[in-house]
Each structure stands twice: as structure tokens, then as C-alpha cells.
Amino acid sequence: MDRRIFGIETEYGVTCAAPDGRGLSADEVARYLFRKVVAWGRSSNVFLRNGSRLYLDVGSHPEYATAECDDVRQLVTYDKGGERILEGLVADAQQRLEHEGLPGTVHLFKNNTDSAGNSYGCHENYLVRRQGDFARLSDILVPFLITRQVLVGAGKVLATPRGAVYCLSQRADHIWEAVSSATTRSRPIINTRDEPHADAEYFRRLHVIVGDSSMAEPTTMLKVGATDLVLRLVEAGVIMRDLSLENPIRAIREISHDRTGTHAVQLADGRTMTAVDIQGEYFRRVREHVDAHGINDADPSPTTKAVLDLWERGLHALESGDLSSVDRELDWVIKLRLIERYQAKHGLELDDPRIARLDLAYHDISRTEGLYNLLAARGMVERVTTDLEILESTAVPPPTTRAKLRGDFVRAAQDARRDYTVDWVHLKLNDQAQRTVLCKDPFRSVDERVDRLIESM
């Protein structure tokens, strides 16, 4: 595909900590978080002026789905914009709690597991063409998605009967199938439920649910950018060596529990390879393809070059055992370094409760309390986007995709105080005429029908 539509859906963990331990339940906190949203949107499921969707998911998890983006860097920006929007909800909820004399501090975490062992997700969406063999696409992608955690995992301190261990991925231990149409019951790597949110005759949405939520901007860039490049490889018809794993679910756990990336996993054909070897094979094939053909016969963009550079440096760091070249860019390495410094300073074992609190605090989206955000404020991690672009993304839709039509419509309807209904493909004025515009092309940012609908308000 010359252009691809990307989107990220992030479920956030929520808690209300009180000094006496009697904080509000997650359900109660979620209601406070969404009071303001329900007040103006009459629902806890709304589309925003920036084209994104904000809603309360199953299990009291606030969820933010980015607007459609057609550029990886743009997606990183809108993903971060979601954090800022949710941070605003936290501030409002905190104010309401204090006004009502209720104790406790509300925290939102961009992570994937809670202390009770529940898991919530970060789902990546990639638009692919309907034509082509989706089963082949999935077969080639699964080993890549299982092994990419050595680079883009969020890191996690896991308590085991033999003591605490530092794992690469928060999500790996909660995945039960390679490919399935379910998202919660079996938690597959790729979800096959066919909801393209586009013209189903031409497009299909690849729904990847195995990934961890990322705090570090370069990690998000690599996670989505490398997956896009592998998809382009498949779409170009490049023949890949079969890297199918004998037992994908066992492999994803074993890889997560070995932070060196050197644990050998069994392939379906009887060979054994390490996660780094498998990732290296994908990287080399992608690099060869980009060097030979560019990206769709165009020169690689600065973002593509940055993705390839970080992918290569990450693999070299794992091969050499020296992670210093990526300890400002990859989440699991940034957090590991933070934990190691804290352990050394205070003489702590990995299973100390203070380490668990630090692990969690890394993912707090607060810019004043979240450890990742404090590192970013001090210039201790690398950036992909800017604070100004992130701020703009909270209010303005991406200008190059269907999200602009949706965002402009929502803004106009709200300003005109008109009753309206929107979803990913429909824009509707709830007046006597019930006028509706169907927007099936996610690449289209200009539409005379939408212009007329807005002018009629």
C-alpha cells in the first residue's frame, strides 16, 4: 500500500489511593473520570474534536482510540495526545473528589497488568488490502510479533514462586492463541474479527492485540514502524523463510522471561532459533527490500530511517549484552536501568514492594508524578515528537485522513449546539431529516457532502 492507515487503542489502568487504604473502587473512580464527558456527550462513549474516540471499556478501563493516522510519527503524537486528554480527566475527577470531601488520589496507568493479575490491552490497527491471502499474512507476522518484545516490550517485575524476575513483556503471559476472533476470552496475538471501518470490498483491518502499551516515544515508533515494514514486505510478495514456531504460546512466555534475548525456541520444522536471530532475519529482509526498492519506489522517509536505525541498534545491543546504546529509547531498558539504580542506592532485592511501586509509577501518565514523564522532562529519554505537537493533537484532527472530516463535523455540531451521532464511518445530524454521510474511505480528508452537512447547521 502506498499509504497505510494506523491507529492505536489503549486501555488504561485506574486506581484511587487513600492514606487509610479506603480509596474508591475502580468502578467509582471511572464514574468520576467520565462525569465531565457524560455531561457534554450524554454518554461514556464519545468521539472528540481531534477525531479520536474516548470511552469506558469493560472492567472500568478508560480507553482512548487514536484518530486515523497515515504516518508513524503522526501516530506517536496522537497516542501521546491521548495521555494528555486522560490526564485532564484525572485533574477534573480529583477536583470533584476534593470538593465532595472524599479522600484519595486518582492515578491512571498506561500499562497492561494490575496487582490482581488482570490484563488490559494496547491494540494496534493496520489497514491492509482485502485482496491477498490473510492467512499467509498472519503466518508470516506471528513469529515477528512474538519475538519483537525483545525490543518493544514494556518490561515488568513478575513475582514467581522462585522469586521476582524482570520480564520483557507485560502482555506475554496473558496471550493464549496465535490467531482468533476473540479479544478477551482467549487473547490472541492477531484478532481476526473482520471490522474494517472502511470499504469492506477493498480493505481489511489487521488488529494486533499482543503488544504492550508504550511510554517511550521511540518504542511506539519502532513497534508500529517495524510492523508496517514487515507488512510491506509481505504485500510486495517477498518470499520469507518459514519461521513458524512449534508452540507460539509457550515461545512468547519463554522469550519474555529471558531478557537477554538468547533463549532458543523450537520452530515448527525442528530447528531452534533465538528471538534475536528471528528478529534479525526479519530486519535483514526488510533492510534489503528498502535498499532495493525504497518504500513504494520512493526514498525512505526520515521516520523509516529512524525505525531501521533503532531496530538495528536494538538487535546489536542484545547481541553484545551492552544496552547503553538504547537505554534512552526502549521502554523495558529505560525501566530496568531505573530499577537497577534504585536497587543499588537502597540495597533492595527485586521482590521488594518498593520496586513494585516503582515499576507501576513508571507508567503513571501524570506529568508531575509519573516516572517516565519525569525522565522526559529532565531530557533523560529520547523524543520523537514535541510537546507543542502533542498539545495540538488533543484538539485538532490529523489533516490527511478521514479523521479530519469527523473532527470538523464534531466541532461544528458542538459549536452550533446541534444533536449529532458519529462513529468511525458515519456522520449524522439528529434532526427531522436525519441527514447522514457515510465516509468509507479512510484516506479521504476532503468531502463535499460533509462540507454541505456542516454548512447546513
Swiss-Prot record:
Similarity-based family: Belongs to the Pup ligase/Pup deamidase family. Pup-conjugating enzyme subfamily.
**Which residues are recorded as binding Mg(2+)?**
9, 55, 63
Catalytic positions are: 57
**Which residues lie in coiled coils?**
none
For this entry, list what GO says about its biological process.
modification-dependent protein catabolic process; proteasomal protein catabolic process; protein pupylation
Which catalysed reactions does the entry list for this protein?
A: ATP + [prokaryotic ubiquitin-like protein]-L-glutamate + [protein]-L-lysine = ADP + phosphate + N(6)-([prokaryotic ubiquitin-like protein]-gamma-L-glutamyl)-[protein]-L-lysine
The keyword Flavoprotein is annotated on this UniProt entry: no
Task: Tell me what else is known.
Answer: The reaction mechanism probably proceeds via the activation of Pup by phosphorylation of its C-terminal glutamate, which is then subject to nucleophilic attack by the substrate lysine, resulting in an isopeptide bond and the release of phosphate as a good leaving group.
Matching PANTHER family? PUP DEAMIDASE/DEPUPYLASE, PUP--PROTEIN LIGASE
Task: Name the pathway it acts in.
Answer: Protein degradation; proteasomal Pup-dependent pathway; Protein modification; protein pupylation
Known function: Catalyzes the covalent attachment of the prokaryotic ubiquitin-like protein modifier Pup to the proteasomal substrate proteins, thereby targeting them for proteasomal degradation. This tagging system is termed pupylation. The ligation reaction involves the side-chain carboxylate of the C-terminal glutamate of Pup and the side-chain amino group of a substrate lysine.
Record-level Gene Ontology MF annotations: ATP binding; ligase activity, forming carbon-nitrogen bonds; magnesium ion binding; ubiquitin-like protein transferase activity
Q: Does the keyword tRNA-binding apply?
A: no
- Give the EC number(s) listed in the UniProt record: 6.3.1.19
Quote the record's binding site residues for ATP. Answer: 53, 66, 424
Q: Which key words are in the record?
A: ATP-binding, Ligase, Magnesium, Metal-binding, Nucleotide-binding, Ubl conjugation pathway
Name of the protein this chain belongs to? Pup--protein ligase
Task: Name the enzyme group at the top EC level.
Answer: ligase
Provide the gene name from the record.
Answer: pafA
